[in-house]
């Protein structure tokens, strides 16, 4: 199984005043690293942490320690990601969302931890739901 990490749970874990903080703490206790993500999620996480008054470097420590790994290379997946952005332009999907959908497509058994309800809409390979851990 490939555990995929979205922005929401990562921010919630590091931000004690986040609505989903307790839920995120419990999930991170249960999940076995590494969690896979992408640089777009890292950028969103750092931005949201800074905006909430937290040190964005806290998120980077997860990468340094190997808790979060970034196996996704946008350059290698650009055509597929562009197609996903176009497909979900009515939602709309962010770059991070499209990258995570693609990451779910390239793994046989993905499980995505997210607080984003849009992932109930998104499909991998056109029709397959993405297995989720949500609050």
Can you name each region flagged by the protein language model?
Residues 117:
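Short, ordered loop/turn segments at secondary-structure junctions
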Residues 94-98:
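Conserved glycosyltransferase catalytic-site signature
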Residues 1-18:
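Metal-dependent nucleic-acid phosphoesterase active-site entry motif
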Residues 2-3, 22-90, 102, 106-113, ...:
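PIN-domain endoribonuclease scaffold, especially VapC-family toxins
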Residues 17, 51, 93:
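Charged, low-complexity surface patches
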């Amino acid at each position: 199984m490939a555990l995929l990490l979205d922005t929401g749970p990562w921010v919630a874990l590091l931000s004690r005043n986040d609505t989903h903080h307790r839920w995120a703490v419990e999930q991170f206790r249960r999940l076995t690293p590494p969690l896979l993500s992408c640089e777009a999620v890292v950028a969103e996480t750092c931005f949201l942490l800074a905006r909430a008054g937290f040190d964005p470097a806290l998120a980077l420590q997860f990468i340094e320690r190997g808790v979060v790994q970034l196996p996704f290379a946008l350059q290698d997946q650009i055509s597929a990601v562009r197609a996903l952005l176009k497909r979900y332009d009515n939602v709309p999907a962010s770059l991070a969302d499209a990258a995570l959908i693609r990451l779910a497509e390239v793994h046989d058994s993905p499980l995505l931890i997210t607080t984003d309800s849009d992932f109930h809409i998104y499909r991998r390979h056109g029709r397959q739901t993405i297995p989720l851990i949500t609050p």
